[in-house]
């Protein structure tokens, strides 16, 4: 018998008492539909802001990612496959975090060239140094960098929660299919309200 969404929830691991928030590519190039890579997603931005405020209030670590290309040699094949990525140059407006989610001093912005926040970056080392052992993953896009980052987080032995309303995709079908896959094998896909409830229960005394 095929697994249902409810079946998958039976295997939820949840968060630990040492979580961090990873906002994947919540940058102008993806949140602004004027960019070829972008989509109109104010509800995703709002959900990210809600989580961001809670993590900050609880004194928990926050990490952002962006995609930046500093020379023509970086990620050549990826950029040939997706030429729209070429707008993500180091001096471009498109690589900056959406102003609604402006990082604070001390909140790292991880530069990456590929889909995963972990591939060829020092994210794992930074998380390990802080004693982080679970991640709330949000951002854009569900079928691309969010999925790749969530899978790599698991493969680096983090418990992973994907905040359902805080991720988005240009293609609704791809969004739904990838959330199902993530929930089946790599992460807990939970509503933002449930994530906030877990955070308060586990870490409320840290704020």
Task: For the regions a language model picked out, list residue spans one by one.
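Short glycine/serine/threonine-rich phosphate/pyrophosphate-binding segments
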Residues: 142-149
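Internal catalytic-core helix/loop-beta-alpha segment
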Residues: 91-140
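Short acidic-hydrophobic, aromatic-tinged amphipathic segments that line or gate anion-handling sites
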Residues: 110, 188-195
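Active-site-proximal loop->helix
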Residues: 170-183
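A short glycine-rich beta-strand->turn/loop micro-motif centered on a GG-aromatic cluster
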Residues: 136-139, 158-172
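Active-site acidic carboxylates
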Residues: 1-104, 108, 199-207
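Glycine-centered short loops/turns at secondary-structure junctions
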Residues: 59-60, 131, 157
